[in-house]
Amino acid sequence: MAGLKRRVPLHSLRYFISMVGLFSKPGLLPWYARNPPGWSQLFLGTVCKGDFTRVIATKCQKGQKSQKKPSHLGPLDGSWQERLADVVTPLWRLSYEEQLKVKFAAQKKILQRLESYIQMLNGVSVTTAVPKSERLSCLLHPIIPSPVINGYRNKSTFSVNRGPDGNPKTVGFYLGTWRDGNVVCVQSNHLKNIPEKHSQVAQYYEVFLRQSPLEPCLVFHEGGYWRELTVRTNSQGHTMAIITFHPQKLSQEELHVQKEIVKEFFIRGPGAACGLTSLYFQESTMTRCSHQQSPYQLLFGEPYIFEELLSLKIRISPDAFFQINTAGAEMLYRTVGELTGVNSDTILLDICCGTGVIGLSLAQHTSRVLGIELLEQAVEDARWTAAFNGITNSEFHTGQAEKILPGLLKSKEDGQSIVAVVNPARAGLHYKVIQAIRNFRAIHTLVFVSCKLHGESTRNVIELCCPPDPAKKLLGEPFVLQQAVPVDLFPHTPHCELVLLFTR
């Protein structure tokens, strides 16, 4: 009924989050762009139940018939390369202009559903709300395109497993699922988002593996040694390679021999063609582990790579987070800086700060920058970057934001103006971080950056904007979503950064 006001209990939040999940439910994408060839109107109108990337790949393969899972994989050919491209870069068949239309439509639909739910939580009639731009209460800006469309990744991680020809020493990306037992590792040199240098290093690592007497570690309990390869590059062309190795029961002497062999291969052997700036080796018995859990061992070269961004020289350690599209990151960080509205009286709180680029780029415009980051190496990089660039009004703290933030805020006076910037991982922010932000009255402006606004990130936004809830210890006034800016850092994929400005 028109004008009906109703409050939605917060316990129904789980249902809403399941409905707003990116590319996971029918009708989420409006697809108002021109229909790509081979995509049916039914598909375009109901996108899309199930896995988005799989549906995209299927619909884009015009005229291809479905095939049963082969009893043997056979040689590598164009079909394997296309299948991998459809999984890793499902929008690769569209022009970049069409890709941007798809992404903008998706972000708009997510915001519409999110706003509608928040309005109901606050007892506002959705039918009488006055929109600012096309059914949205917040101002949705046009999507900012990536300055670089192809080969934009500055970091790639390659797996090792059986290729289409059955060779277990194949380096690339996975097709299939472990559940179905049909995982195939396909070389990635044809993917549009991978730079040639990354593919070159991966190819030479494959050459090395195939001449090594040691087997790869495909499944932990089955033994094997050689594991994944990570390649990092900067805009100057410097290249860092990180090889992960399962030590099994090798002695330190035996491990030393293997490190010397791989080092020799990339310095004086065939791998010298890669021109690596540095080579790291990490012994790991876990799927993934940090430098603190298992130190990265520098076999040769420089311990860091450096990047120039926003007039800063930035140091990047092997496991430090840095946006994978450097040129796009500059657009993203400029957008964040503009939305913060900081001035010389402002304290900038940079939560999940990584190497500290956002805070440090705004340091000259603020009274102080306070950064919080989980990874010690990233914090060390941020401190180095601050010192090298002559920035003296910043401090960075290592640890979990939910443990550090409450104490950090208590030490500040209520009269100080604080602007918070959060750029969490896809898992979102811990609920105690949300509590601390909501309950600290001096935070009037919050900029939230999300590369995938669903799941916990959606819950974060809703708990920032919902009415005070003593049961959840959300006592402060709610934030209001004012502006949203999509920034494309991931051409050829459905992903997109979304920068949200909240005030109260």
Swiss-Prot record:
SS bond partners: none
Catalytic activity as recorded in UniProt: uridine(54) in tRNA + S-adenosyl-L-methionine = 5-methyluridine(54) in tRNA + S-adenosyl-L-homocysteine + H(+); a uridine in 12S rRNA + S-adenosyl-L-methionine = a 5-methyluridine in 12S rRNA + S-adenosyl-L-homocysteine + H(+)
Enzyme Commission number: 2.1.1.35, 2.1.1.-
Active-site residue list: 451, 497
Gene3D superfamilies to which the protein is assigned, alphabetical: 2.40.50.1070, Vaccinia Virus protein VP39 (3.40.50.150)
Transit peptide location on this chain: 1-16
GO terms for MF: rRNA (uridine-C5-)-methyltransferase activity; tRNA (uracil(54)-C5)-methyltransferase activity, S-adenosyl methionine-dependent
Record's function text: Mitochondrial S-adenosyl-L-methionine-dependent methyltransferase that catalyzes the formation of 5-methyl-uridine in tRNAs and 12S rRNA. Catalyzes the methylation of uridine at position 54 (m5U54) in all tRNAs. Specifically methylates the uridine in position 429 of 12S rRNA (m5U429). Does not affect RNA stability or mitochondrial translation.
Protein family (similarity comment): Belongs to the class I-like SAM-binding methyltransferase superfamily. RNA M5U methyltransferase family.
Protein name per the record: tRNA (uracil-5-)-methyltransferase homolog B
Organism: Homo sapiens
Native organism taxonomy: Eukaryota, Metazoa, Chordata, Craniata, Vertebrata
Gene name, Swiss-Prot/TrEMBL: TRMT2B
